[in-house]
């Protein structure tokens, strides 16, 4: 996955950036008829069945009349028996009282405990959800109220907790609750360049962070994103277009680009943004 400085010459990141719409050529001109798709070819109850009976002489066809109503009653009875059996524990989307679970690794147990007040306050007060930390299973459990079916706030709270577990600060992760156009992207160093092994992986991670974290800070401030480097995984939080620019910068550093070259591209992009403003 090769990138160059031209990747930073795209349009400036916009807070409300969205993917481009499809061209008319990509959209099919006609759709199949619903009548054809839902055409019922099953035999009706008042129809006859033609049954071939093997005979030694000739291939005569006998008409046999079956009691279809009896077959329907048997099928209904089987369905009723299945419905009385054990129900699946998997809940469908929109069920009242639906819950989500976010597992907590060992190294994030203490930070979660220290920031627990700052985490459950926006979830309970702003979103009106129920949240608890299961000490036995070491996971955060978030649940919708019994009288609510909408899962939008439930998903926002789940993304907020997950972002904190990945290593983002509470003040940065809470933007997932307040803003609707933010996304969270995760990839590994090996996804960019498979041939990196041993010390080369450490050097690539060092180029991303920079001395005293300056390189990462420059990318964050220029692209208006937040980046977390956790071992060989890179997590980026930001708007759609901003994620693209930050990802290109990080990938360029992983592939061996000189940090000064990346700095120059970011400075040019920042200067163009200042001129437009």
UniProtKB/Swiss-Prot annotation:
Residues 8-27, 72-81 have a biased composition (Acidic residues). CDD domains: KH-I_PNO1_rpt1 (cd22391), KH-I_PNO1_rpt2 (cd22392). The keyword rRNA-binding does not apply. SUPFAM superfamilies: Eukaryotic type KH-domain (KH-domain type I) (SSF54791). It holds the Pfam family KH_PNO1_2nd. Residues 30-40 have a biased composition (Polar residues). It comes from the Eukaryota. Residues 198-250 form the KH domain. It is found in: Nucleus, Nucleolus. One of its GO terms (molecular function) is RNA binding. GO terms for cellular component: nucleolus; nucleus; small-subunit processome. Its main location: nucleus. Gene3D superfamilies: K Homology domain, type 1. Residues 1-52, 72-100 are annotated as: Disordered. InterPro entries: KH-I_PNO1_first (IPR055212), KH_dom (IPR004087), KH_dom_type_1_sf (IPR036612), KH_PNO1_2nd (IPR055211). Keywords: Nucleus, RNA-binding. GO terms for biological process: ribosomal small subunit biogenesis. Signal peptide: none annotated. Part of the small subunit (SSU) processome, first precursor of the small eukaryotic ribosomal subunit. During the assembly of the SSU processome in the nucleolus, many ribosome biogenesis factors, an RNA chaperone and ribosomal proteins associate with the nascent pre-rRNA and work in concert to generate RNA folding, modifications, rearrangements and cleavage as well as targeted degradation of pre-ribosomal RNA by the RNA exosome. Positively regulates dimethylation of two adjacent adenosines in the loop of a conserved hairpin near the 3'-end of 18S rRNA. Part of the small subunit (SSU) processome, composed of more than 70 proteins and the RNA chaperone small nucleolar RNA (snoRNA) U3. PANTHER family: RIBONUCLEASE Y, RNA-BINDING PROTEIN PNO1. Belongs to the PNO1 family. This is RNA-binding protein pno-1. It comes from Caenorhabditis elegans. The lineage of its organism: Eukaryota, Metazoa, Ecdysozoa, Nematoda, Chromadorea.
